């Protein structure tokens, strides 16, 4: 890293640490949305990203008509057709209760990919919880803050054609469960 590179994000490096879990959650949601869901792109010009933290900007209705508010929502316009949704958790949000009350309804939304972002070190616990509740997660991601900003790691990949051809024991090892 050169000195020029090191100082380009000095404002980011000097941001004060969050003072509460809520402040950390809000900051993480905003940073993850910018890092991973920055739509529209040239390839997906109709996609738009909405962040529902700290205030709800685009609620999502489930099949029963109940409103849910995922942290991050990506829709295809016109028509606001739901494509992706993401839930960002802090360490205290990786629990059975949270999974039952929040993750299960999000994973049941039709025709949408559900991504779950948990802090580094909580990926295994999140996968075990999701397996116990039969939650279909399209992608597990871990996040943490480093001096340069947020770092996001993919800890699973969506099932593909090759996955179906693998023996069950190999699929289980790849999922980390």
Q: What does each model-found stretch correspond to?
A:
Residues 70-102, 114:
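Conserved catalytic cores of phosphodiester-cleaving nucleases, focusing on short active-site segments
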Residues 95-133:
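Short, charged, amphipathic alpha-helix that recurs within catalytic cores of restriction-modification
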Residues 37-44, 79, 108-115, 133-140:
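Structural alpha-beta junctions
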Residues 120-176:
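Domain-level recognition of nuclease-like catalytic cores that cleave nucleotide substrates
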Residues 3, 100-112, 165-177:
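A short, terminal or domain-edge coil/loop segment
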Residues 2-26, 39-85:
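Active-site metal-binding core of divalent-cation-utilizing nuclease and nuclease-like domains
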